[in-house]
Amino acid sequence: DKYVASKRKVAAEYEEYFKNVPDIEFFVDSPNTVSNYWLNAVILQDKEAQIDFLTQTNDNGVMTRPIWELMNRLPMFENCENDGLKNTIWFADRVVNIPSSVRIN
């Protein structure tokens, strides 16, 4: 499928680019899986690095965004029971979605 092949090509270019960038890890396929790379994302060192990355990229015309807003941080759910969400918070404070367009020739 051309669509998925194009998405995977974009991801491969990101993987190559970010492999030599310190403190930034590009999300890649897990072993024995084949991702369609619907969204591309990077993991940064901490919340401060995430904010810096978002500011720098968006200020320079590259549209990036945090991976998600946690539901327990939304006013209507802030009093709902949860287990502390340690792992979820770790990712929310570090992951940034980067442009994931399709380029079909």
Over which residues does each language-model region extend?
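PLP-dependent aminotransferase class I/II
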Residues: 1-105
